Amino acid sequence: MSAIYNLEPQPTASAIIHTTQGEIAVELFAKQTPLTCRNFLQLALDGYYDNTIFHRLIPGFIVQGGDPSGTGHGGESIYDNGALSGDLDPWPMDQRRGKNAGPHGVNFKDEFHSRLKFNRRGLLGMANEGAPDTNSSQFFFTLGKADELTGKNTMFGRVAGDTIYNLAKIGEAEVEEGGERPLYPIKITRIEILINPFDDMQKREKKPRPQQISRPTPAEKKQKKRKGGKQLLSFGDEVGDEDGEELPLPKKPKFDTRIVADLDQDDSSKQSASKKSSAKRDAKPVANDVPKREEKPEPKPVKESRRSPSPQPVAQKKEQPPKKHYSEHSSPEPEEPKKKSLLEKTNEEIAALKASMKRTIHSEPVKQEKKKSALEQLIPDTAIRGRKRRPGASSNPTREEQEALDLLKSFKAKIETAPPEKNAAQPAVNPDVEDGEQDGQADEEKVCDLHFIANCQSCKAWDKVEDNEDSGDEGWMSHKLSFAADKLGKDLSYRKKAEEELVVIDPLAKARTLKEEKKATRDAKTGGSSRAWDRGRRDRH
């Protein structure tokens, strides 16, 4: 990384881009890219980038901004329309080519340098239109290595310090599906210039102000003309007082009142049609007489034409009710029911089809439908219901109780009459053993001829049932259960017996006794003393 910094030249300008995600400190290479840096710093000084957004984001590649419209299709440079093209300006006109040249030229040229390459993240470059020398105001930051941009886009700065992490956060924003626009774009609030190498740079005033001043002037003139016309139409009496020549103006309200009076008479009688036609005929020459007298002002016939449609909707509204009355008694009556009959027929056919479908499918359940209680609705359809009581059981409950008592008495009688239990079971007789062998060799077991094993289970016939087995024996019914009386628990003799049988051993006392026993055996061997001189004295005696 240090080698990369050694290759890049020393920056000569710096600024801080304040965003809603945090600050981004930028160092600019104004010596290597003077046109690009001047354009960026001048637009930042003018507040051109304030409240703009980063409208494009490609994760791991770039994040782009600098368009006031926020669409990616806007932006302008400080060199547009031949600005700064003098002989002493930074970009004279004789050095401009193509679309950059001329009084209507746009954008500015690319500035490439052999030591400025897009070889890592955090580098600042100018965005163009995909063609050479089409730079305007849009710029971008790299989010990774982008060698394909070297030689195509101008690199004029880099991110400095720990603010690179704020740029990384911007690069992690969510993007719309199938697009490159962030869901929640980050906004540039302002750009603060720290070091500006261009001493002659000053804040410019916005140009669209004179256009705004020039535009309203014709509109005001038009509005004044319209206002004058409206005054003539709506305030005719006042104008008549001021200008005595305009005599036909009072005739217009008279004409309007006549039309309204004629329309009121048309509602009351059927002869209104002839009166209306005559009133309209009279109205036309009156309207024609007004522009003839005042042929010079052209807007007057227009005003009359504007006036003329105003009473027409009133006449139409008042003419509609009699038309409806005529329609009720005239031929349109059968037309409406015809349309309704067609609709009714189609609706009836649809209803018949639905009814037929319901009959074929839901005919049986409709007949069997019964109202169910809340408890019955909780029972699932797959549940099996129990056997119902007999019809007379609820009315005569003593009958069932009597039957149960009779069954109990019969069972007791059967137990009393049961045969006694067999005390001793007869010994099982093996059919394979002969009678002579059972007498003399009862204790000996027979050896198998095949395996030579005594009492071989493989050669024994297990499927033969012994004769003494009796499955119908009822002797068990007379059996009685008898157990020895538990006296230990009642008189607490069990506890006393347990205390007597319990042996308590003290390990210290046991160890002491064992030690004494060992000592006694040792003394017995040595004659009662372990000393050699004592043993010798005892041997002499």
Curated annotation (Swiss-Prot):
Where do Basic and acidic residues bias regions lie?
279-307, 316-348, 361-374, 513-525, 532-541
List the disulfide bonds in this chain: none
GO terms under biological process: mRNA processing; protein folding; RNA splicing
What PROSITE patterns does UniProt report for this protein, alphabetically?
Answer: CSA_PPIASE_1, CSA_PPIASE_2
Q: Which UniProt keywords apply?
A: Cytoplasm, Isomerase, mRNA processing, mRNA splicing, Nucleus, Rotamase, Spliceosome
Compartment(s): Cytoplasm; Nucleus
Region listing for Disordered, in residue ranges: 199-443, 513-541
- Regions of compositional bias (Acidic residues) in chain numbering: 432-442
Broad class of where this protein is predominantly found = cytoplasm
- Give the residue spans that cross the bilayer: none
- Broad class of enzyme this protein falls into: isomerase
What are the EC numbers? 5.2.1.8
Gene Ontology, cellular component aspect? catalytic step 2 spliceosome; cytoplasm
The residues covered by the PPIase cyclophilin-type domain are 11-193
Q: Which residues form a coiled coil?
A: none
Entries under Pfam families matching the protein: Pro_isomerase
A molecular-function term among this protein's GO annotations: peptidyl-prolyl cis-trans isomerase activity
Q: Which reaction does it catalyse?
A: [protein]-peptidylproline (omega=180) = [protein]-peptidylproline (omega=0)
Purpose: PPIases accelerate the folding of proteins. It catalyzes the cis-trans isomerization of proline imidic peptide bonds in oligopeptides. Involved in pre-mRNA splicing.
| Subunit and interaction comment | Associated with the spliceosome.
Please give the family membership noted in the entry: Belongs to the cyclophilin-type PPIase family. CWC27 subfamily.
Q: What is this protein called?
A: Peptidyl-prolyl isomerase cwc-27
Please state the gene responsible for encoding this protein: cwc-27
